[in-house]
């Protein structure tokens, strides 16, 4: 089997972990990793709109984080079955403490990875340093507990096949809700307010039903984003590009 792992640098702080995992392979697997940070052409060719993508034998696309059990199945010649992550989302907006995400408090924001230690977090911070951004987004916390967050990157440096303009920001990640409460509306609105000081527009890629990479689609429509059309359709997702005037 041929395994190709595509990733946008360290935009997902777990990318380094996944790269190490895919390269711990047996002779039955041929593994290559591809950093898309400056390779916009490859991202467009492979239709990558997630911070990482695993492709098996040049055909089978997998979007979820790589796990040991996933790799074990591939080593046995078994194609894993992947299902979209579509949790029930509460729509009651909850607001605790909202603050900018910076290098100083990123230890809180990285709780979204579900890891106690995150070796790739410094890689992500360096990506923002490289484009002169001190603020990554906004975090929603209650004490030292992460509730949600919203992050962005200048669209000019996003490798996905989207419009790249200096007056446009790209919403990279919006996270945090449960069945009862919506924890991500408040940080998203704070982020939009901050972005409006520099940018005229915000773009985001969202799935119709899943919350990965962002979503679901109705969430952004409720927040005033306009549906600009479908970017990708397959058995896992139906991704839309959305835009909003800031």
Spans of features found by a protein language model:
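A conserved beta-strand-loop-helix scaffold within acyl/acetyltransferase catalytic domains
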Residues: 120-168
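Conserved catalytic-core motifs of GNAT/GCN5-like acyltransferases
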Residues: 60-62, 224-240
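Local sequence-structure signature of Cys/Sec-based thiol-disulfide redox active-site neighborhoods
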Residues: 1-26
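Conserved acetyl-CoA-binding loop-helix of GNAT-fold acetyltransferases
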Residues: 180-197
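Non-catalytic, surface beta->alpha helical segment in thiol-disulfide oxidoreductase systems
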Residues: 57-85
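Conserved GNAT acetyl-CoA-binding A-motif
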Residues: 195-211
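Conserved active-site alpha-helix within GNAT-family acetyltransferase domains
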Residues: 209-229
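A short, internal acetyl-CoA/4′-phosphopantetheine-binding micro-motif in the GNAT/acyltransferase core
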Residues: 172-183, 208-209
């Amino acid at each position: 089997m041929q395994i190709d792992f595509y990733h946008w640098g360290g935009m997902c702080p777990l990318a380094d972990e996944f790269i190490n995992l895919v390269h711990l392979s047996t002779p039955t697997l041929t593994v290559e990793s591809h950093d898309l940070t400056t390779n916009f052409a490859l991202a467009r060719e492979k239709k990558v709109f997630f911070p990482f993508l695993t492709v098996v034998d040049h055909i089978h696309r997998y979007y979820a984080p790589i796990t040991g059990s996933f790799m074990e199945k591939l080593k046995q010649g078994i194609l894993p079955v992947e299902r979209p992550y579509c949790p029930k989302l509460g729509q009651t907006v909850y607001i605790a403490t909202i603050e900018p995400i910076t290098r100083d408090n990123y230890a809180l924001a990285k709780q979204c990875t579900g890891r106690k230690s995150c070796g790739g977090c410094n890689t992500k911070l360096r990506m923002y340093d490289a484009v002169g951004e001190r603020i990554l987004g906004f975090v929603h916390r209650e004490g030292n507990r992460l509730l949600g967050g919203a992050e962005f990157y200048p669209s000019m440096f996003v490798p996905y096949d989207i419009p790249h303009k200096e007056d446009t920001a790209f919403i990279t990640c919006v996270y945090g809700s449960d069945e009862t409460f919506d924890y991500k509306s408040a940080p998203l609105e704070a982020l939009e307010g901050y972005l409006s000081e520099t940018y005229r527009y915000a773009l985001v890629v969202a799935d119709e039903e899943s919350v990965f990479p962002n979503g679901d689609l109705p969430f952004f429509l409720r927040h005033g984003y306009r549906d600009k059309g479908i970017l990708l359709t397959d058995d896992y997702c139906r991704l839309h590009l959305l835009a909003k005037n800031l």
